[in-house]
Amino acid sequence: MIFEITSRKEWMSILDSVDTYDVYHTYDYHHLSLEEFDRPILMVYVENDIVVGIPLIIRPIPDTDLFDATSVYGYPGPVSAGITLNFDASKMAKQVHSFLRENNIVSVFSRLNPYIPHQSLILGELGSVNIAGPIVGIDLTLNMTQQRERFSRRLKTQLNKAERNMIVREGSGIEDITLFHEIYTESMDRLNAVDRYYFPLPYFIDLFDSDQINAKLLLAECKTTGEIMAGSIFTISKEIVQYHLSGTYDEFLDAMPSKLLIDHMRKYCSNKNFLHLNLGGGLGSNTDGLFRFKKSFSPSLRSFTLWSYIVNKKAYKKLVKKHKAENLSDNLLFPEYRS
């Protein structure tokens, strides 16, 4: 049986019934930054003791009566209970395909979560799952000494210096949230970030208002002047802690305060039954300077993967043909008909 859920209570009831989930699967996170006409759903498959939930955002395709599905920013993908290595993905795939066709959904794209088990197995008969690049995680099952032993030598030196010059405090209230928004926006401007990496102030206010997301803001403060140098937002779920967003004022870049913030969160999360502190990867999943910055904390890498599924091939080809006729350059992203 397959059905969709759109209510907050029922959505969280399904999440509470699965083996594990991340903040990127919650109802509240799916309602943070919707575009006009976007509709978040949790597509649920149930068979005997098996439960699979796939969170999606359904979007209308302009100038048509068709739709496609995408995922939130972050690491969502399927969550499940009762899945074993003998799981028959083909049975679920038939029902998912029928559900999507009945709802005029042409294609599905979703980022996946490398810390949630069985995602590739569940999606094995539905389109393709491709590796986008590596991400870095700190193993929180190790004790703090073992974790620090995996730091690069240079990072240890930088942290020692940072601890002498800065203090870390937890941000709270609208003033600190507004301050972080300012720091983050300045950082995105410096990096010439594309629009999708910018978030308005109400996004951050709603983020911290949610009891499902459980966000924590850490701020690095200069010991001598009291100036705030940088801020980082972490999200906390059942087993997974995420390094969600971070920013540093331009004038303090050389001091690398964000490294101290990550280390502070690492210490906070240790010995609390969390399994992973995910630092993410490089910009656009590349092994760039951002990736190397994160890798200095841990050699533990996992593959960040993307799920793509063409539900209605005829409609998809027609949309791609129309897009190419109206645009000078090809779109290498999925789906190809979106610019």
Which stretches of residues belong to each language-model region?
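A short, structural micro-pattern
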Residues: I50, V72, N104, V129-A132, ...
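A short, internal acetyl-CoA/4′-phosphopantetheine-binding micro-motif in the GNAT/acyltransferase core
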Residues: G74-N86, T141-L142, S246-A255, L283
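Conserved acyl-donor/pantetheine-binding loop and adjacent beta-alpha core of acyl/acetyltransferases
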Residues: R59-Y75
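Short, high-confidence coil segments that cap the C-terminus of an alpha-helix
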Residues: D38-P40, E102-I105, K272-F274
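A conserved beta-strand-loop-helix scaffold within acyl/acetyltransferase catalytic domains
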Residues: I2-N48, G53-D63, L112-D254
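Aromatic (often tryptophan-rich) hydrophobic motifs at membrane interfaces
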Residues: V44, K94-H97, Y203-K318
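A gly/proline- and charged-residue-enriched helix-loop-helix capping module
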Residues: T70-P117
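Active-site/acyl-donor-binding loops of N-acyltransferases
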Residues: L42, P60, L121-T145, K272-S339
